[in-house]
Amino acid sequence: MTIRTQLAGLLLIAGTLLPLNLRAAQTTPTALDKSIDLSVGDHVKVHQILTQLQQAVAQHNAAGVAVLVHYPIKVNPGKKPFTIKNEKEFIKDYDRIITHDIADAIFKQKYETLFVNSQGAMIGDGEVWITGFCRDKSCKQSDIKIGTIQDTKNLEP
């Protein structure tokens, strides 16, 4: 048996085993997943929002980011905070809101290293927070959206 044949056999075996391992990893909730489920509501949705946010920011897709946000939202991308009432305003002010530093924090964030507490899942050093929001008073229906966007370099301790 040649090295090429042995290598091909190993690749074939690895190819059949890898999807099983990936499926097991995706269905087995981690401690982080459980923490997100308790604090925010649904770790799968948080992971989706993080991925969608990263893709939309990479494409400079203001509308793609705007649909992920809970309104109204108070944003603080610099020295003076302001309130965005809806998606239309967000799209108009996108370049003021998603600054280079905020975009950089979004790009660098890995799902596995999210910080989670009762406020939600934190991206970067708090530049963006993904949070659960009740749709009604009984909170039987909820949404998971971006609830905070801020430049943490300008925040006072």
Question: Where do the language-model regions lie?
Answer:
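Bacterial N-terminal signal peptides that target proteins for export
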Residues: 1-10
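Bacterial N-terminal signal peptides
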Residues: 9-19
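Sec/Tat signal peptide C-region and signal peptidase I cleavage site
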Residues: 20-24
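C-terminal-biased regions
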Residues: 25-55, 66-157
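Charged, alpha-helical scaffolding/interaction elements associated with membrane systems
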Residues: 58-59
